[in-house]
């Protein structure tokens, strides 16, 4: 155990004057840098075009992609809208809102709460983390996030027509070190080089302030998304975006609003029909989708109908759910959730030493910020009508793209100064949390403090690193621990152990301890007792590459099958159209070839794309020869007819002469 009572040195903070100058020209990334908002409910990808960020549409033509991953019985992995569409019939293997589990332990109260409401299995991994299970296989939340990031990567590559390797990925401002590290792991598994992890409210502020006139301004960003809530106070001054404070709740968002409404609907249905829908997974999934839809509709209308015919069945027959939901009733159901956003806003103002009257603009970010009651609450907190200058669903990705352009050197007049959201410290004598870096300290930063031994003859010290605001160490989040050994025996209070905390621009923590007497040093990049090891990450990368290859094969097979079915359809249509022009024996041979090709397609699961291609090509060549001959016959007949008409037309002329 360390003692903070002896040899307490003055705090030493090494300020870094400019993040922009820290990256040398040789370090600048090559190629495009995309910005990705990896959201709980939806994700979005953006790229800079000149000096303007552009949100890229996905394959379905939509600018946001559901952060949903599903695994089918035949081993296919679906991501985005296709995964969400089949959730009702495959709810146990459809993973959503897994961002709420990222970097969390299985025993965390938040995880235990989610266990009761999600249709898929949340399991305890060997390292104690919360993982998920689908089709009998377990996945870390980082892996699931990687599948979504891969979809975003593919979306950008399809638009740009080139490979993309570099990205800036956003995280909730109130994410702790474990959650930030797990997000970086997700990027690595997906094949992306994550240049920077930046906070979502900060990214939204970048999108808001990039093209604004120079001038000092303090703004607040109220970010209520699908799974998390953040509030940040920023000062914008001539291209410098300085975060003054941040606060939030990493387990408060649209998912909780959905759960509250589903709970209400289950209760109403049980009261009316006497049936408990929680026993029926398929009914619950339909109810979840209906609740989400109703929630969205009530942002623009005062009443909505929830109609779910044949929601379930009992001995008396099928049961239907049909009820009206008013905006007022919905606001009553989720009122406590909205109230939970008030205190973090007050704390953020207090920590920034800013009065609400000094806030020039309040930006609304995240899908839930569209709810009228949420907007009214924001107006009450800050005393002004919130700004709608940014798109709540797209601003974060756009800000990430701007930061990517800054790192690439394409945007040179923007400087982002972010903060660490939670205090960092170590456990000292008596279990006290001794803070070395307090919350809302600008990052990157480095700070050292000298401690001593707590007992006579102590030859080693254990450094336990915590993150949080509680006075007792064990009440905070344990990030990791390590030991400094080989300290010469001496009376308590004599040895001098210098502990240094270093937080990089991603908010990732490095800790070192050095015995000043012997010069011995021990240092680690903080990785909690959970988290993914290097070997696990490598295995997941290999698995992702293997899956990518399998997906490419599956895609090729689907494309070949579609091509084959198209050729068969066209051939049969033309055979019908030109039936009287085609030789019967050759038509019969072509029909036999069509039947053979159809047999191959019926057995497509056991056929290779090459075999189907070959059958297609043979069919196409055979049909082309037949139709070419028919065309020539028709042309010859038409030519003969034209000649006869010309001859007939000449005869009257001769008679006149």
Swiss-Prot record:
Range annotated as the organelle transit peptide: 1-27
Keywords, alphabetical: ATP-binding, Mitochondrion, Nucleotide-binding, Stress response, Transit peptide
Region feature Disordered, mapped onto this chain: 637-657
Gene Ontology MF, one: heat shock protein binding
Pfam families noted in UniProt: HSP70 (PF00012)
GO cellular component: a single term: mitochondrion
Highest taxon listed in the record's lineage: Eukaryota
InterPro entries: ATPase_NBD (IPR043129), Chaperone_DnaK (IPR012725), Heat_shock_70_CS (IPR018181), HSP70_C_sf (IPR029048), HSP70_peptide-bd_sf (IPR029047), Hsp_70_fam (IPR013126)
Coiled-coil parts of chain: none
Protein family per UniProt: Belongs to the heat shock protein 70 family.
Name assigned to this protein: Heat shock protein hsp-6
Organism: Caenorhabditis elegans
């Amino acid at each position: 155990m360390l003692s903070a009572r002896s040899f307490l040195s003055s705090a030493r903070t090494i300020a870094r004057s400019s993040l922009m100058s820290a990256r040398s020209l040789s370090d600048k990334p090559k190629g495009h840098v995309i910005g990705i908002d990896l959201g709980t409910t939806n994700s979005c990808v953006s790229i800079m075009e000149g000096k303007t960020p552009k949100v890229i549409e996905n394959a379905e033509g939509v600018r946001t992609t559901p952060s949903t991953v599903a695994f089918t019985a035949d081993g296919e992995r679906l991501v985005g809208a296709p995964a969400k569409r089949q959730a009702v019939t495959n709810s146990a293997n459809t993973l959503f809102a897994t961002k709420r589990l990222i970097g969390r332990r299985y025993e965390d109260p938040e995880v235990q709460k989610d266990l009761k409401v999600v249709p898929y299995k949340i399991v305890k991994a060997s390292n104690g983390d919360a993982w998920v299970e689908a089709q009998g296989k377990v996945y870390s939340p980082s892996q699931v996030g990687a599948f979504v990031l891969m979809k975003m990567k593919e979306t950008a590559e399809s638009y740009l027509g080139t490979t993309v390797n570099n990205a800036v990925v956003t995280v909730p401002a109130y994410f702790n070190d474990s959650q930030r590290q797990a997000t970086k792991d997700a990027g690595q598994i997906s094949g992306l080089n994550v240049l920077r992890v930046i906070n979502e409210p900060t990214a939204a502020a970048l999108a808001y302030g990039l093209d604004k006139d120079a001038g000092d301004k303090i703004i607040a960003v109220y970010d209520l998304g699908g799974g998390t809530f953040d509030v940040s106070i920023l000062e914008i001054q001539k291209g410098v975006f300085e975060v003054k404070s941040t606060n939030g709740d990493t387990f408060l968002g649209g998912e909780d609003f959905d759960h509250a409404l589903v709970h209400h609907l289950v209760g109403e249905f049980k009261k009316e029909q006497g049936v408990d829908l929680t026993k029926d997974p398929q009914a619950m999934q339909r109810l979840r989708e209906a609740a989400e839809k109703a929630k969205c509709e009530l942002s623009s209308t005062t009443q909505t109908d929830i109609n779910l015919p044949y929601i379930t069945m009992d001995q008396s027959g099928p049961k239907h759910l049909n009820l009206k939901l008013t905006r007022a009733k919905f606001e009553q159901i989720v009122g406590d959730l909205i109230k939970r956003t008030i205190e973090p806003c007050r704390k953020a103002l207090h920590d920034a030493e800013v009065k609400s009257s000094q806030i020039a603009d309040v930006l609304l970010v995240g899908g839930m910020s569209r709810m009228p009651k949420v907007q009214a609450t924001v107006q009450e907190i800050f005393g002004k009508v919130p700004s709608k200058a940014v798109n709540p669903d797209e601003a974060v990705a756009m800000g990430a793209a701007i930061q990517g352009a800054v790192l690439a050197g394409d945007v040179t007049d923007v400087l982002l100064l972010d903060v660490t959201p939670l205090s960092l410290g170590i456990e000292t004598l008596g279990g006290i949390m001794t803070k070395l870096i307090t919350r809302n300290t600008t990052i990157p930063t480095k700070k050292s403090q000298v401690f001593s031994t707590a007992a006579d003859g102590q030859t080693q010290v254990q450094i336990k690193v915590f993150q949080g605001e509680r006075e007792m160490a064990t009440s905070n989040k344990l990030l990791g621990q390590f030991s400094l050994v080989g300290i010469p025996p001496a009376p308590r209070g004599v040895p001098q152990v210098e502990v240094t905390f270093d937080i990089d621009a991603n908010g990732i923590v490095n800790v070192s301890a050095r015995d000043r007497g012997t010069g011995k040093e021990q240092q680690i990049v903080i990785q909690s007792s959970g988290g993914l090891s290097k070997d696990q990450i490598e295995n997941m990368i290999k698995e992702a590459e293997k899956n990518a290859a399998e997906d490419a094969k599956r895609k090729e097979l689907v494309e070949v099958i579609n091509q084959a079915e198209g050729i068969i359809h066209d051939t049969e249509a033309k055979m019908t159209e030109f039936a009287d022009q085609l030789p019967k024996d050759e038509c019969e041979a072509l029909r036999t070839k069509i039947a053979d090709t159809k047999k191959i397609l019926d057995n497509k699961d056991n056929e290779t794309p090459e075999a189907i291609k070959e059958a297609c090509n043979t069919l196409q060549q055979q049909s082309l020869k037949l139709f070419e001959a028919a065309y020539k016959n028709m042309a010859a007949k038409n030519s003969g007819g034209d000649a006869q008409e010309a001859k007939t037309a000449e005869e009257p002329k001769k008679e006149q002469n």
